[in-house]
Amino acid sequence: MSIRVGIVGISGFGGGEAMRLVASHPSFELIYAAGEGSAGSRLVDRFPGVPAKLADLVIEKWDPVTLPKLDLLFASLPTGASAEALARVPEDVRIVDIGGDHRYVEGWAYGLADVWPAEIEGRIRVANPGCFPAATLSALAPLLAERLIEPDNIVIDAKTGISGAGRGGADSKFGYAETNETVVPYGLLKHVHMPEIAKTIERLSGGSAAGLVFTPHLVPMTRGVLATMYCRGRASTGECLDAARRFYAGRAFVRVTDKPPQTKWATGSNLAFVSYAADPERNLVIAMGVVDNLGKGAAGQAVQNANLICGLPETAGLDGLPVWP
């Protein structure tokens, strides 16, 4: 029996990626789509490559009162929008919120699926991690869990593709001329993902992340996040790699690599790649994490979380290879 799925915020990049994954999922049936800027359009008008079975599905204006009977709802709304939008969704509808409003909110599981899958299984409300937390925490979690690095002296330098800024419109600041051949730091000292990263570092380590520094940069590529973390610790490169291999043993989506990871490796997938370089004499550990910001950083992890809460195989609908080149 199919699981009846809806997506709110389908007009954007995150919602569109969720639609792509749901469309080919063996247990999901997309029966409802909502998008503020595209209400009244057919799905094929917004996404010309949509499967024929979904082409004529009409995108509706979001109204939880008129929802059809759903089993599962994906929400991909801007920060600040999903808390109000989802407040009146019936309690028996499972929700995975790709947006940021419900991370570490009471009643919502934090959906870092490769680290705490057991805490997600069977839950009704799950908050997806952000794209930068997905990349950084995938690499940091094994080291923090085994106390190989100090939690309060971590410096994160992250690069993200333009799609991480959202789809935008005609007046978007992220058009080709503004973003090609330039690198832009942003959100210095106050990026919205910084509290989420700090709280999870503290949860993993039991220590303080008060000294956390996080600087993201927008780079001229479509997809991808590369996070490089500079940490204090006496572990060797081999010890870091071994810790990650133990931590992720049996996990399907995190790949531990001896080589520095590249964003291309993850494009179009739910994979995370992590690697390490360390110099014990300098008390230095460099951790690296790569994800597709729309995959593991958004819709891919959302589907992984949905599989967990619906009692499905965790890899269902997510076993495709990354796109290369």
UniProtKB/Swiss-Prot annotation:
<dbReference type="InterPro" id="IPR050085">
    <property type="entry name" value="NAGSA_dehydrogenase"/>
</dbReference>
<keyword id="KW-0560">Oxidoreductase</keyword>
<comment type="similarity">
    <text>Belongs to the NAGSA dehydrogenase family. Type 1 subfamily.</text>
</comment>
<dbReference type="GO" id="GO:0005737">
    <property type="term" value="C:cytoplasm"/>
</dbReference>
<dbReference type="GO" id="GO:0051287">
    <property type="term" value="F:NAD binding"/>
</dbReference>
<dbReference type="InterPro" id="IPR000706">
    <property type="entry name" value="AGPR_type-1"/>
</dbReference>
<comment type="pathway">
    <text>Amino-acid biosynthesis; L-arginine biosynthesis; N(2)-acetyl-L-ornithine from L-glutamate: step 3/4.</text>
</comment>
<keyword id="KW-0055">Arginine biosynthesis</keyword>
<dbReference type="GO" id="GO:0070401">
    <property type="term" value="F:NADP+ binding"/>
</dbReference>
<dbReference type="InterPro" id="IPR000534">
    <property type="entry name" value="Semialdehyde_DH_NAD-bd"/>
</dbReference>
<comment type="function">
    <text>Catalyzes the NADPH-dependent reduction of N-acetyl-5-glutamyl phosphate to yield N-acetyl-L-glutamate 5-semialdehyde.</text>
</comment>
<keyword id="KW-0521">NADP</keyword>
<dbReference type="Pfam" id="PF22698">
    <property type="entry name" value="Semialdhyde_dhC_1"/>
</dbReference>
<protein>
    <recommendedName>
        <fullName>N-acetyl-gamma-glutamyl-phosphate reductase</fullName>
        <ecNumber>1.2.1.38</ecNumber>
    </recommendedName>
</protein>
<keyword id="KW-0028">Amino-acid biosynthesis</keyword>
<dbReference type="Pfam" id="PF01118">
    <property type="entry name" value="Semialdhyde_dh"/>
</dbReference>
<dbReference type="InterPro" id="IPR036291">
    <property type="entry name" value="NAD(P)-bd_dom_sf"/>
</dbReference>
<dbReference type="GO" id="GO:0006526">
    <property type="term" value="P:L-arginine biosynthetic process"/>
</dbReference>
<dbReference type="GO" id="GO:0003942">
    <property type="term" value="F:N-acetyl-gamma-glutamyl-phosphate reductase activity"/>
</dbReference>
<keyword id="KW-0963">Cytoplasm</keyword>
<feature type="active site">
    <location>
        <position position="131"/>
    </location>
</feature>
